[in-house]
Swiss-Prot record:
This is Fe/S biogenesis protein NfuA. GO terms for biological process: iron-sulfur cluster assembly; protein maturation. Involved in iron-sulfur cluster biogenesis. Binds a 4Fe-4S cluster, can transfer this cluster to apoproteins, and thereby intervenes in the maturation of Fe/S proteins. Could also act as a scaffold/chaperone for damaged Fe/S proteins. It comes from the Bacteria.
């Protein structure tokens, strides 16, 4: 497999997306049935860096190629990767698993929902990045999640992050431990200017709580 930019633009990041041999075979057979010489697939992420991120794949005929895309050449077909999606496809794997019903194409992209933050990112963007990349993966094991509501500049307490918990965290009896020992500690270690973290969740609604 070779990777190249189909345009003359300088690459900030090179794709490391993996299409497994079984997925290559499946896609190659599928593309052959389209009767279009040179047809490939285009891979991109809709709503990248958000909880609504969705990894997508579409047919890409030669006359439909976006000149800014990155081309990964496989033995039977080319794959074109949307350049802005590359950071969100880091460590992504497209695989095909055969079963008694035929098989299923799977697309795992662990970084598709993780926001990207640069050195000039706002404190809101930095908090959201940490929540999405470090906090929520742990809470997901209990069916929970956490989101930033706002950052307040409190005259008495300084910069305060207001959070809201959902899923299995809402109404959970262990939420104070989760907030103080987990979320607040992690956020304040990485964002020193943050003075306080508070919970705005209505925990009287405990129907789906992990601990009651």
């Amino acid at each position: 497999m070779s990777t190249e930019n189909t345009s003359t633009a300088v690459a900030e990041e090179i794709p490391n997306l993996l299409i497994t041999p079984s997925a290559q075979e499946y896609l190659g057979d599928l593309l052959e049935k389209q009767n279009t010489p040179g047809i490939g697939v285009r891979i991109f992420v809709e709503n990248p860096g958000t909880p609504r991120a969705e990894c997508c794949m579409a047919y890409s005929a030669p006359d439909e190629v976006n000149p800014a895309d990155y081309k990964q050449e496989y033995s039977d077909f080319p794959a074109y990767i949307d350049a802005p999606s590359i950071p969100y496809l880091l460590d992504a794997v497209i695989d095909y698993n055969k079963d008694r019903f035929g098989g299923q194409l799977t697309f795992r992209a662990p970084n598709s929902k993780v926001p990207r933050v640069g050195p000039d990112a706002s404190i809101e963007e930095r908090i959201t990045y940490i929540l999405q990349s470090e906090i929520n993966p742990g809470l997901a094991g209990h069916g929970g999640n956490c989101a930033l509501v706002e950052v307040q500049d409190d005259p008495e307490n300084g910069l305060t992050a207001v959070l809201k918990f959902g899923g299995g965290c809402q109404g959970c009896s262990a939420i104070d431990v989760t907030l103080k020992q987990g979320v607040e500690t992690t956020l304040r270690q990485q964002i020193p200017e943050l003075q306080r973290v508070v919970d705005q969740t209505d925990h009287t609604q405990a129907e789906g709580a992990y601990f009651k």
